[in-house]
Curated annotation (Swiss-Prot):
This is Smad protein daf-8. Residues 16-137 form the MH1 domain. Residues 292-302 have a biased composition (Polar residues). It is found in: Cytoplasm; Nucleus. Residues 234-268, 292-317 are annotated as: Disordered. It holds the Pfam family MH2. SMART domains: DWA (SM00523), DWB (SM00524). The keyword RNA-binding does not apply. The gene is daf-8.
Length: 546
């Protein structure tokens, strides 16, 4: 956001409101100082005074109570890069991660409910609530305990250590392999919220223009499109997936992957009655009711018929069980053979490991909350009460190279990870590109699995698709231990700042990138571990740290 001079002296009430500006907003939108917060507060106060609602606005910001009064005002565009008034208010005092108007809704008690087509809005930041997306529901994994799954893997005490060590060793081996590159252009987080709004009839938030695309560039070897219009978005949303049940999935697959059926469940044939038996149009029902052959009392052998004389076959209720005692005995014996492994969610959903070239710097960091900021500043882990911030500038390395120091100085606002509807997205907040390697994203988009994607500034992309992962895990559980074990790679995402690697770069491996980190998704990785244990793999080897 642009700077503009702050007048002297400062109103004490403005200083009090500036203290309420969120720290993450000051970092990602401003210059990291309280002076920027004062500038934003003064700008918003001018808007409130212009519409004679400053007292109500001040009262709402200080008290932080939804019961405070409404602050009606025009949703005018502010000077500089502050955007619309309501977005600036919400970003400053309530939601530091808000990007679109479709991410919030007015509370029921607000007398000036927000509408993107209306000129007037309520500036009270506590008269809005965050739109909670429904979590992607996945079926449990069914494991047959009597199958031969081959030789089980050797698992160490920590599942993360297994793949962390293997990845670094294999990087040396596959350094000579070709790693494709692609440039990602588009906003998959916006597509996620636009799709949700379309499914729920919130068309006031929809943007009928182009949503963006994957654009081929001199450094990209693949070009993809995220969707060209709102019509194509709805078409993909309503398309049915004939291969498997249509469990709800938020987000939009690229054209290279199979589109899923949103918010619906396709029942199997055993649970349904044929349409011929179940449904009749109004005219047919009328013909039956007025037919002389229709009688509520079935005298003799007379049966109800249609008007043209065709007999009506009654639908008999199904018995609870149609199995013999022997069949029920087989079912009870099979209950001990098959076991379901449910997906479980833990608050600590993300683990970060920071590297400078091939050297791990610092310790692993666990992340809680629905989003995590990885920036280039110097805040320590103890400074973040919510454990949702990871500052690379805090870590020292006495053997740091000049190139690494230069890249660290360019990171700035960094990147942000989101956990939305059970799936993971990445947003680039830097002024420099970042390079992302995600097997899950590559599989979803139809890329080669080791493809490295260049994400330009302000870009977003989905790096973990829960529904796709569930399908792969369900298939692997019918094969071998190694097939299941290898899916841990889908739970790892690599992100490099400024310097990419692959066939279009001098660096053939991520180990030569100056500044990068690995993000491990704890919940899917734990699911893989639970399936392995259920399949009969030996328990993890305990060490002296146990």
């Amino acid at each position: 956001m642009d700077d503009f001079p702050s007048p002297e002296p400062t109103d004490p009430r403005l200083e009090a409101m500036a203290q309420k500006v969120l720290e993450e907003t000051i970092i990602t939108e401003g210059d990291g100082t309280i002076y920027w917060a004062l500038k934003v507060t003064r700008l918003l106060s001018r808007v409130a005074k212009k519409h004679q609602c400053f007292e109500a606005f001040y009262d709402a910001v200080i008290k932080g109570d939804p019961k405070t009064r409404c602050c009606p005002a025009h949703n005018e565009k502010l000077i500089g890069n502050f955007g619309r008034a309501i977005m600036c208010v919400l970003r400053a005092f309530r939601f530091p991660v808000i990007r679109y108007e479709s991410q919030v809704k007015s509370i029921l008690t607000c007398r000036h409910a927000f509408n993107s087509h209306s000129r007037n809005v309520c500036l009270n930041p506590y008269h809005y609530r965050w739109v909670e997306l429904p979590t992607c529901q996945v079926p449990p994994i069914i494991v047959n305990k009597e199958l031969d799954y081959g030789e089980p893997p050797i698992r160490t005490e920590d599942a993360l250590d297994d793949w962390n060590q293997k990845d670094l060793k294999e990087e040396q081996v596959v350094a000579s392999w070709d790693v494709p590159n692609v440039t990602m252009r588009g906003d998959e987080i916006k597509l996620l919220y636009d799709r949700y709004a379309a499914e729920n009839g919130d068309f006031q938030y929809m943007n009928y223009g182009n949503f963006g695309s994957f654009d081929g560039s001199p450094c990209s070897s693949t070009t993809m499109s995220l969707g060209s219009s709102f019509a194509s978005l709805l078409q993909q949303s309503n398309r049915q997936d004939d291969e498997e049940p249509g469990y709800y999935r938020s987000g939009l697959s690229s054209p290279a992957s199979h589109a899923a059926s949103p918010r619906e469940f396709i029942p199997n044939g055993n649970d349904t009655i044929s349409l011929d038996q179940e449904m009749m149009d109004d005219s047919e029902v009328s013909d039956i009711m007025h037919s002389e052959n229709f009688s509520s009392e079935n005298n003799g052998n007379r049966k109800p018929t249609y008007a043209d004389g065709r007999p009506i076959t009654p639908i008999e209720p199904r018995p609870l069980y149609r199995s013999s005692a022997l069949e029920l005995g087989d079912l009870s014996r099979q209950a001990g053979i098959y076991e379901c492994v449910e997906y479980e969610e833990s608050p600590s959903w993300l683990k970060l490991i920071y590297y400078e070239e091939g050297t791990m710097i610092g310790e692993k960091a666990d992340v809680e909350g629905h989003h995590c900021l990885i920036d280039g500043f110097t805040a320590s882990r103890t400074d973040s009460e919510t454990r949702s911030r990871f500052s690379l500038g805090w870590y020292n390395n006495p053997n740091r190279s000049p190139q690494t120091a230069e890249v660290r100085g360019l990171i700035g606002k960094g990147v942000r990870f989101y956990l939305l509807a059970g799936e993971v997205y990445v947003e680039n907040l830097c002024n420099i590109p970042v390079f992302v390697q995600s097997i899950g994203a590559n599989m979803k988009n139809g890329f080669q699995l080791n493809t490295v994607s260049k994400l330009p500034p302000t870009g977003t992309m989905k790096v973990f698709d829960m529904r796709l992962f569930s399908k792969q895990l369900r298939t692997a559980a019918e094969k071998t231990y190694q097939d299941v074990y290898c899916l841990s790679r889908m739970c790892t995402v690599r992100v490099s700042f400024c310097k990419g690697w692959g066939e279009h770069y001098r660096r053939s491996t991520v180990l030569r990138s100056p500044v990068w980190f690995q993000a491990h998704l704890n919940n899917p990785m734990h699911w893989v571990d639970s399936v392995l244990t259920c399949m009969g793999a030996p328990p993890r080897i305990c060490s002296s740290r146990t």
